[in-house]
Amino acid sequence: MSDRKPVRGRHQARKRAVDLLFEAEVRGISAAEVVDTRAALAEAKPDIARLHPYTAAVARGVSEHAAHIDDLITAHLRGWTLDRLPAVDRAILRVSVWELLHAADVPEPVVVDEAVQLAKELSTDDSPGFVNGVLGQVMLVTPQLRAAAQAVRGGA
């Protein structure tokens, strides 16, 4: 058995995805580009850890569906615009909305709980309640959005 501990599950993978989205926004590039850069760096330098597969999947998924995710978040903001939110809150919401829409193996309450926990760890005192409220509203429409996406994929 190896002494090297694996990444601590999906919570750490989500946290790293939030970090990557934040970095991408600051650098003005897509999260997928950041993932590609990190993968190349880990390949070139064996002492640099590879990204957790879930981190890469989330970051690439958010990049691929960015417009839809941002539209969905914006539709559920009350008294705020997406660009006025703290950048870390935007990243947390984007990761969480992607999971609500595309991570069928993650129960919705787990997605919200993880987002609130990340907001507690990474953002302002008001952010956990705000994130919880926005995601609670998004959760009301995700079953219909998932069903519509499935119908499109299934050719129906």
UniProtKB/Swiss-Prot annotation:
SUPFAM superfamilies reported for this sequence: NusB-like
Gene Ontology molecular function terms on file = RNA binding
- GO cellular component assignments: cytosol
According to its UniProt record, what is one Pfam family this protein matches?
A: NusB
Carries keyword Coiled coil? no
For this entry, list what GO says about its biological process. Answer: DNA-templated transcription termination; transcription antitermination
Superkingdom of this entry's organism? Bacteria
Q: Which UniProt keywords apply?
A: RNA-binding, Transcription, Transcription antitermination, Transcription regulation
**Database matches in NCBIfam families:** nusB
Biological role: Involved in transcription antitermination. Required for transcription of ribosomal RNA (rRNA) genes. Binds specifically to the boxA antiterminator sequence of the ribosomal RNA (rrn) operons.
Annotated family: Belongs to the NusB family.
Q: What's this protein's name?
A: Transcription antitermination protein NusB
What gene name is listed for this protein? nusB
